[in-house]
Amino acid sequence: MVTILDRINPDAKRVRHPEKAHRPDTEVLRKPDWIRVKAPTSKGYAETRSIVKEHKLVTVCEEAGCPNIGECWEKKHATFMIMGEICTRACAFCNVATGKPNALDMAEPENIAKAVKEMGLSHVVITSVDRDDLADGGAEHFEKVIWAIRAASPMTTIEILTPDFLKKPGALERVVAAKPDVFNHNMETVPGNYLTVRPGARYFHSVRLLQRVKELDPTMFTKSGIMVGLGEERNEVLQLMDDLRTADVDFLTIGQYLQPTRKHHQVMSFVTPEEFKSYETVAYTKGFLMVASSPLTRSSHHAGDDFARLRAAREKKILLAAE
């Protein structure tokens, strides 16, 4: 049996995933050559880690065990995770700890803004744990973080990756009103997998949330991502693309699911680079402005460069429509 301990405070010996303790161990498949990455050792990585720790911040890069952390942190790119490191959901794929969250850190918005300014970020990604325990799901905290970054670094573009705000009336409207540049909400997987992979969420609620963002602010870029290798069929992925285009989503990311521990959902397959390229081609034909599809693609990987390309793609589309 594997006991998963909290990495944030190892002295506490708190079980990191108590909801998964009863599950039988599953085999962790050997990764193919195309998905292996080097351990992070660069000077830039160390500097980014130092800034994160200095401001007592949490990053999804660390909490989710992202394979791209070495590359991103070397370039001083980081995705900040707000509202603590404990999530109220228990998704079968996720390495973020589950449990009863702590009270919100009221200094967090200012601390993030200081880190963004110190790192000289032209584009920042802010995500969060699910906070079903809060009346607004954390919408006000998102709002405060966006405002603080705008005040400290007016030229920095802001991308948010939000939870679904399920049963939190008015929460989405509040976050959209804060005017992030990109609103990202990940679908994570195809609808047939939701019961086992993402049991606390509702597929069509997430689709509707993305659609509602565009209704509230048609100029705001919307983005969503999925993992493959969870047992989905190709036609299910193509249908998900259609659902997202119906919601007028601009940007789709597709990446390989990697199993954090033996207690998490098993990797059912490693999708080849050629299959990822095929998904990208199909997605563009369906009308997405931007598509990132590769084994190591993650929601915030190359987010700054992708935002510039996304903006250019929209401008090109507008010019073509005017001809």
Swiss-Prot record:
[4Fe-4S] cluster 2 binds at C87, C91, C94. Pfam families: LIAS_N, Radical_SAM. It comes from the Bacteria. InterPro entries: Aldolase_TIM (IPR013785), Elp3/MiaA/NifB-like_rSAM (IPR006638), LIAS_N (IPR031691), Lipoyl_synth (IPR003698), rSAM (IPR007197). Binds 2 [4Fe-4S] clusters per subunit. One cluster is coordinated with 3 cysteines and an exchangeable S-adenosyl-L-methionine. It catalyses: [[Fe-S] cluster scaffold protein carrying a second [4Fe-4S](2+) cluster] + N(6)-octanoyl-L-lysyl-[protein] + 2 oxidized [2Fe-2S]-[ferredoxin] + 2 S-adenosyl-L-methionine + 4 H(+) = [[Fe-S] cluster scaffold protein] + N(6)-[(R)-dihydrolipoyl]-L-lysyl-[protein] + 4 Fe(3+) + 2 hydrogen sulfide + 2 5'-deoxyadenosine + 2 L-methionine + 2 reduced [2Fe-2S]-[ferredoxin]. The keyword 4Fe-4S applies. GO terms for molecular function: 4 iron, 4 sulfur cluster binding; lipoate synthase activity; metal ion binding. Residues 73-289 form the Radical SAM core domain. It is found in: Cytoplasm. The keyword Iron applies. GO terms for cellular component: cytoplasm. Its cofactor is [4Fe-4S] cluster. It is an enzyme of class 2 (transferase). Pathway: Protein modification; protein lipoylation via endogenous pathway; protein N(6)-(lipoyl)lysine from octanoyl-[acyl-carrier-protein]: step 2/2. NCBIfam families: lipA, PRK05481.1, PRK12928.1. Belongs to the radical SAM superfamily. Lipoyl synthase family. This is Lipoyl synthase. It comes from Rhizobium rhizogenes (strain K84 / ATCC BAA-868) (Agrobacterium radiobacter).
